[in-house]
From Swiss-Prot:
An accessory protein needed during the final step in the assembly of 30S ribosomal subunit, possibly for assembly of the head region. Essential for efficient processing of 16S rRNA. May be needed both before and after RbfA during the maturation of 16S rRNA. It has affinity for free ribosomal 30S subunits but not for 70S ribosomes. It comes from Streptococcus agalactiae serotype V (strain ATCC BAA-611 / 2603 V/R). This is Ribosome maturation factor RimM. Its main location: cytoplasm. The PRC barrel domain binds ribosomal protein uS19.
């Protein structure tokens, strides 16, 4: 079974078994709702166990969660640095034009018939996602995921069609 990252445990929160999680999902309320089961992976990306969410709340840039059956800091301190993942069969269906990051990363990027590079990472700096395109012999291209730039995402052919706006590629 394949798993996908939804957050990283960065620290404990108080003494009552809560953890600070840096979320990497667009579905926070769904992923961290009470009763949701997530997989816990260690720093070496090895499966540790399935855990059930007992509670969730937001605090600043973090999601504060508590696992069922772990109600003291001593129960959870060992999980700092671990990753929370969701099983593939728990992924939600998306609307047309919406994609999971794992579907986008690795796609070839074309402008017209010219291959620009391959998407290696997705950043979330603010209003829209930014796709990082790895190019041969050039610096990475930061591609905003906005309609005038990203014209088509074709998952079946593993390609993205773009139109680079003036000033977007500083190496031209």
């Amino acid at each position: 079974m394949e798993y996908f990252n939804v957050g990283k445990i960065v620290n404990t929160q108080g003494l009552q078994g809560e953890m600070r999680v840096l979320s990497v999902t667009d579905f926070v309320e769904e992923r961290f709702k009470k009763g949701q089961v997530l997989a816990l992976f260690d720093e070496k990306n090895q499966f540790v166990m399935d855990i059930e969410i007992a509670s969730h709340r937001k605090q600043k840039n973090f999601d504060i969660i508590k696992f069922k059956g772990m109600y003291h800091i001593n129960d959870i301190e060992k999980y700092k640095g671990f990753t929370l993942k969701v099983a593939e069969d728990q992924l939600s269906d998306l609307k047309d034009g919406e994609f999971y990051y794992h579907e986008i990363i690795g796609l070839d990027v074309y402008e017209g018939e010219e291959l620009i590079g391959k998407i290696k990472e997705i950043l979330q700096p603010g209003a829209n996602d930014v796709w990082v395109v790895e190019r041969h012999g050039k610096r990475d291209l930061l591609l905003p995921y906005i309609p005038p730039v990203v014209l088509e995402v074709d998952l079946s052919n593993q390609r993205v069609q773009v139109e680079l706006m003036e000033g977007l590629d500083d190496e031209d």
